[in-house]
């Protein structure tokens, strides 16, 4: 079911599939150009108005972001072009159940805002590996998690976003793949490098608005074309391709006939493509890793003005996460109705003719809808939507990955690095990420086997659960120590890696040909595997922790839930190392009297290095630290966000029940 890679079944795309009318008219091109100009203008505005000259300013937007741009940024960071391609594609292939992945986030967003973020803020951290270092001490956990997170960024996030964006670019413009991707990444990087997190959050807000407007318009066109909701449900069940024989293959009807449970979210626990116990429990584990411990998501919450703003942002994002079912999954299913021969193709030679890959063209469901259904001008708007979702996800990944590298890895290599050096290192690392991303593209092209969204979720299921287990125990079980956490992560990672490599090597099979992967490794659905992996990791962490010395409470004040309200002074486990670093600090390598030329001034303006605030006294530093670790809320706003959280949970229960 989890569709990953099977190189043996992939045929390289000879060129973009033929579309009746590519984006070559003035209206479409004008819309795209205006879009890029506005995005760059917003990025430059954020660059000039915010303080990017400090690490906190560049990476956390100075903890001054209000709830609505933060909520929009959470949504935009999550919804990449991979969602438009992947959700619509899986919807076209198997119905609405894939939307449960989106709705599952409603609960986890509340867990993030009410339980995880308060601890992260009280801990005074910028990155998730940094939290583990404060909580457990030592360096190996921090370094290991930083490297693993960067690997996940490249192998999973950047790769799937670039692949899905490339589908649109090839269909719409007929451009050379590498030229188009290079241009996109270059523009994306410019405002990430120059603007920092504030720039990313404000451009995300703009792009969320563009995404929602464009998606609603396309949804309207799609439902009008198919004749309304009742007609849609009837026609989808009859969307069967006419060519079902060929290539000397005997193709089972189940490979090309819509599933009987296409309009149900809860599916059979054994035979279902998304079994209901896996959807409720396994999916929650993967979602807990993504929403509560992932750097890209948590970093947005750490930038919030106060806890009420953070909680309101989580609620706003939760409501927005209700929309993908109607904006992406159902339009993907309508695409199967309108373009059955292409989207639902089953004979390998026919699929190669339509989209260049033997195992199906469901990934092309949404792009086809855009290119064939939308009139001029609106087609350009929809391509802008795709570019918006691609670029917003990439900027979020670039900014968060550079934070991880700078704060968790670079500071280990260069212990006495000045703040200016850290800022430059973070920006240079973004450039390195872009190079790696472009080199990764050929590997991404192989990932066309089957359905992109199942590829994304299956890889997440193999890498995420051990991280979720460690963070959950770190916050809610103070008895857990460094040895338990480290070996729980390592053993969980090895188990997940074995399954992932096996699927890369053997493939996951398709309806036409079963995978040769050994049953003992690949026989369990990836959502069940995530659940097994989670509990194995928890058992290892607890067992080793109970067999070794506990961490004294004096090191844990405000780092775990039981001690979250402690007022005693915490002695950090890494305090000795911090003192050593501070002993080498305090010398600013910049000479304030130095005369600078025009080029140097322009460079400093571009990188946000010119705006140095006054040197803070010890008292001012303490006051700033208190602000950055403050989780207090005004009673009125606390009550308002709590009531809204209950309403959001009620809505989540209703939609699950209605589509069950």
Swiss-Prot record:
Q: How does it sit in the membrane?
A: Multi-pass membrane protein
Recorded source organism is Sus scrofa
- Native organism taxonomy: Eukaryota, Metazoa, Chordata, Craniata, Vertebrata
The UniProt entry's sequence similarity note says: Belongs to the sodium:solute symporter (SSF) (TC 2.A.21) family.
From the UniProt record, list the reaction(s) this protein catalyses: D-glucose(out) + 2 Na(+)(out) = D-glucose(in) + 2 Na(+)(in)
Q: Where are the transmembrane segments?
A: 29-47, 65-85, 106-126, 172-191, 209-229, 271-291, 315-334, 424-443, 456-476, 527-547, 639-659
Localisation per UniProt entry? Cell membrane
Q: Which UniProt keywords apply?
A: Cell membrane, Glycoprotein, Ion transport, Membrane, Sodium, Sodium transport, Sugar transport, Symport, Transmembrane, Transmembrane helix, Transport
| Keyword check for Lipid biosynthesis | no
Q: Which residues lie on this side of the membrane: Cytoplasmic?
A: 1-28, 86-105, 192-208, 292-314, 444-455, 548-638
Q: Which Pfam families match?
A: SSF (PF00474)
Q: Which GO terms describe its cellular component?
A: plasma membrane
User: Which Gene3D superfamilies does the UniProt entry name for this protein?
Assistant: Sodium/glucose cotransporter
Q: Spell out which residues lie on the membrane's Extracellular side.
A: 48-64, 127-171, 230-270, 335-423, 477-526
Name used for this protein in its record: Solute carrier family 5 member 4
């Amino acid at each position: 079911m989890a569709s990953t890679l099977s190189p043996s079944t992939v045929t390289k795309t000879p060129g973009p599939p033929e579309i009746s009318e590519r984006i070559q008219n003035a209206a479409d091109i004008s819309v795209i150009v205006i879009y890029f100009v506005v995005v760059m203008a917003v990025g430059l505005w954020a660059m000039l108005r915010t303080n990017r000259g400090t690490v906190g300013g560049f990476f956390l937007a100075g903890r001054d972001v209000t709830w609505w741009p933060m909520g929009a940024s959470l949504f935009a960071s999550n919804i990449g072009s991979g969602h438009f391609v992947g959700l619509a594609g899986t919807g076209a292939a198997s119905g609405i159940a894939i939307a449960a992945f989106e709705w599952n986030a409603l609960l986890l967003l509340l867990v993030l805002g009410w339980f995880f973020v308060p601890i992260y803020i009280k801990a005074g951290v910028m990155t998730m590996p940094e939290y583990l270092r404060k909580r457990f001490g030592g360096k190996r956990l921090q370094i290991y998690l930083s490297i693993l997170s960067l690997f996940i960024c490249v192998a999973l996030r950047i790769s799937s976003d670039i692949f899905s964006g490339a589908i649109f670019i090839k269909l719409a413009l007929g451009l050379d793949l590498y030229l188009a991707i290079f241009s996109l990444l270059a523009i994306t990087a410019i405002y990430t490098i120059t603007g920092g997190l504030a720039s990313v959050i404000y451009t995300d807000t703009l792009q969320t608005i563009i995404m929602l407007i464009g998606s609603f318009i396309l949804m309207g066109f799609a439902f009008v074309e198919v004749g309304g909701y009742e007609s849609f449900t009837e026609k989808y069940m009859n969307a069967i391709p006419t060519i079902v024989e060929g290539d000397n293959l005997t193709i089972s009807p189940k490979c090309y006939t819509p599933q009987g449970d296409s309009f149900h979210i809860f599916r059979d626990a054994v035979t279902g493509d998304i079994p209901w116990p896996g959807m409720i429990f396994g999916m929650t584990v993967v979602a807990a890793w993504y929403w509560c411990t992932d750097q890209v998501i948590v970093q947005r919450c750490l930038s919030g003005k106060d806890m009420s703003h953070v909680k309101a942002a989580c609620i706003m994002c939760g409501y927005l996460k209700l929309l993908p079912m109607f904006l992406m999954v159902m339009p993907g299913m309508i695409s199967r109705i309108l373009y059955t021969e292409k989207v639902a193709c089953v004979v390998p030679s026919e699929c190669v003719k339509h989209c260049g890959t033997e195992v199906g063209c469901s990934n092309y469901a949404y792009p086809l809808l855009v290119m064939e259904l939308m009139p001029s001008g609106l087609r350009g708007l929809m391509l802008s939507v795709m570019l918006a979702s691609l670029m917003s996800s990439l900027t979020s990944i670039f900014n968060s990955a550079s934070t991880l590298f700078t704060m968790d890895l670079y500071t280990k290599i260069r212990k006495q690095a000045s703040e200016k050096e850290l800022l430059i290192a973070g920006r240079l690392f973004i450039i390195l990420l872009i190079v790696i991303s472009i080199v990764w593209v050929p590997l991404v092209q192989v990932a066309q086997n089957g359905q992109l969204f199942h590829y994304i979720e299956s890889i997440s299921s193999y890498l995420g659960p051990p991280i979720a287990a460690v963070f959950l125990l770190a916050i809610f079980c103070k008895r857990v120590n460094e040895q338990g956490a480290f070996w729980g992560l390592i053993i969980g990672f090895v188990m997940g890696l074995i399954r992932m490599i096996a699927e890369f090597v053997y493939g996951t099979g398709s309806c036409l040909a079963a995978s040769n992967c050994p049953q003992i490794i690949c026989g369990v659905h990836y959502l069940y595997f995530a659940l097994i992996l989670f509990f194995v990791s928890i058992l290892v962490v607890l067992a080793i922790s109970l067999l070794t010395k506990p961490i004294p409470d004096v090191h844990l004040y405000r780092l775990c839930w039981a001690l979250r309200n402690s007022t005693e002074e915490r002695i950090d486990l890494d305090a000795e190392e911090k003192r050593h670093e501070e002993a080498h600090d305090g010398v600013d390598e910049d000479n304030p009297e130095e005369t600078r030329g025009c080029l140097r001034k322009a460079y400093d303006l571009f990188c946000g290095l010119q705006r140095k605030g006054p040197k803070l006294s010890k008292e001012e530093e303490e006051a700033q630290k208190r602000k950055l670790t403050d989780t207090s809320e005004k009673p009125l706003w606390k009550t308002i966000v709590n009531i809204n959280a209950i309403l959001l949970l009620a809505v989540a229960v209703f939609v699950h029940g209605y589509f069950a």
